[in-house]
Structure formats: structure tokens, C-alpha cells
Amino acid sequence: MATTPAPPGAPPKPTWDPRSATPLPWLRPTIRIRLTLLYGGMFLIAGILLLSIIYLLAAQAVRTGNEPLYKIVDFTDLKVSSSTCPVVDNGGLSLSDFNAAISDCMDHQRKVALDNLLSRSLLALLGLAVIAFAFGYAMAGRVLSPLGRITRTARAVAGSDLSRRIELDGPDDELKELADTFDDMLERLQRAFTAQQRFVGNASHELRTPLAINRTLLEVHLSDPGAPVELQQLGKTLLATNERSELLVEGLLLLARSDNQIVERKPVDLAEVAGQAIDQVHAEAESKGVEVRGTREAAVVQGNGVLLERIALNLVQNAVRYNVAGQGWVEVATAVENGQAVLVVTNTGPVVPAYEVDNLFEPFRRLRTERTGSDKGVGLGLSIARSVARAHGGHISAQPREGGGLVMRVTLPV
């Protein structure tokens, strides 16, 4: 008998992220650009201040102590002409007007000299600013180069390569301290993950042998036609329990292996993988009265065929087992969407609360509360599927279907 799912332990996460990318990315430049702007801006401000001081000092110098050394007192027979100061022409000018014209002409020449000084200084400042920004960009790149090395190592670690280290050389500064701390963290993580995977792998291997022996002994006793009915019934029950334990061991071993990055990749068609999964659950679907349908288009990915087949088999098996007997259906579709291969498994079934969807991917977590019911499986199927999808650089998501059931979607890079 199905029970009412427990209420959620925490409210759903908000869909809006206040740290989402701004519509104007240039408003949030990289740290290298910001350092370049800082270096170049400081040089530009210093240059402007220096130019202003030089201009003011030059203006004061040309305006102070530069009075004419002579004064014309009589120009009866003097003829003066100037191409740079046309107003200096004694024809028709009085003596005082002529002296005033000479003073105005000198003021004009001083102004022209200051304007030339300012324009040429601005051009020189502009050229030096360009050089300063280029030099600042190069220096910022050199200063930040250790961060690039740290980033590349972190990306390699994100790909499940915990053996990578930064090993930064150089002076004992803040960046080297950061790199050394990061290396120490990677060392501890590698030891922890290695110990975990070794334990799971060894435990699974050690449990395989006695389970296989138990299965063989039970099958031999069940094949005896003279065995009592009670003994045969007990043997079938023990055989089913043993099979469940074998599935658990295989699931744990596969879960431990699938957390690693896939090294050897080969072309795998998701349509073919889905077809094989459907063939394996065909008898179970027929016995339960569940229709399996869908359109499967070619969707070739690079990966491990056995692990990808396990994803499809787990999803299709769950879709058949957790369905409506006699009138349910399962739809399996594959396609290539937006440059990615997609496997979608949709099924009818009981209503799944939205807050329970994330729990489906946790090991040994199922919607039913009983642990010894008639359901097959051990609660590792979706955990394995998620681990395998991540190992292939993809992801798997689940959504409740309106009216009951789930929509499982696996997305893998082509």
C-alpha cells in the first residue's frame, strides 16, 4: 500500500539568481582589464596633472618679465610691416596706437606659442597613454599568469583528474601561498576519493563470490524434483533475496566506477542503446500491460556503450515498474537538439510531488517508504544514471508529469 510522501524539509530554491549575468557584460570587465584600466588611468591622471603644471608655469613665464625692451618715441621716417602681425603697420597710426599694436601682437604670439605647447603636449600624452595601457595590459597578464595556471588545474580537477597539481614556482607571495594551499586540498581530496572508491570496489568484489556460490547452491537444490514444496518455496524466496543482493553489489561497483571520467570513448548511438533497453524490458512490460512506444532518431555520442546502456535500461525499467498496470504507457525518444544528444523517457504512473524529485537521484532513496516490498531494484538506478551522465560530461533531470508519472531527460554532448 502506497503511503503519503513526507513534507519537504526545506522550501524550494528560488529560480531567480541575483548573481545572474548582466545584460551589459562590458560593465563587469575581467580583472586583467580592470588592472589595465587602473595602471593606465593612474598614468593618464599623472600625465594630465603634470601637463597642467607645465602649461601654467609656461604661461606665467611668457607673461611675466617679457615687456618690450624698447619703446618707439618717433617714427616719422620709420616704415614697419609684418606678415605675422598685419596690424603692425605705421601707416596712419599714431605713436601710442602703434606701440599698443606691437604689445597686442606680442600677446598674440605668446598665445599661439602656448596653444602649440598644449596641443603637442596632448598628442604626446595620448601616445604615451596608449603605450602605458598596452604595458599595463602586458604586466597585468604577467602578474595574473599564476591564476591562469590555477584555473587550468581546477578545470582538470573538475574533470575528475585529482592527480593534477599546480606546483607553482616563484617567490613566497600571496599567489604561491594560494597555489600551495590548493595543492594541499587536492592531495587530501585525492586520498579521500581513492580510499572511498577502493573500499566500495573491494567490498563489492568480496561480496560477489559468496553471493554467486549461494545462487549456485540454491539453483542446484531447486532443480531437484524430489525436493519438498516448502523447501522449493523457501529456495525461491532465498534466490530472489540473493538476486537482490547481487543487484546491490553490482550497482555499488558500477556507481563507484561511473564517478570517474570516461577515458576510452567510442561512438555510441543513443537510439540503438534505447532500443536494446526496450528489448530487455519487453517481457516485463507485456506482463504488466504497459505499452512502450516512442520515436527514436539517431543521436551519436562519444562514450562508453555499456554505461550508456545502463542509463537507458535503468530509466526504462523504472518507467515500466512504476507505472499503471493494464493501461499505462512508456514513451522513449532520442534526438539531437541544439548540438546535444537527448534521451527522454516519459511514463504514466503515480503522482510524484515536485519536492521529491531531487530525492530520486540519491542512493537508496525511493518514493515508497517500505524497504522489503515487492518492488524490484535496490534504489541505485537513478544514482547510477546520474553518475554515468556526469562522467560523460552531461546531466540528467526529472520533472513530474501532469497527471502522474515522470519525464526523465538525459542530455549528453555530441
From Swiss-Prot:
This is Sensor protein CutS. GO terms for cellular component: plasma membrane. It is found in: Cell membrane. Keywords: ATP-binding, Cell membrane, Kinase, Membrane, Nucleotide-binding, Phosphoprotein, Transferase, Transmembrane, Transmembrane helix, Two-component regulatory system. Its EC number is 2.7.13.3. Residues 1-15 have a biased composition (Pro residues). Signal peptide: none annotated. It catalyses: ATP + protein L-histidine = ADP + protein N-phospho-L-histidine. GO terms for molecular function: ATP binding; phosphorelay sensor kinase activity. It comes from the Bacteria. The modification Phosphohistidine is found at H205.
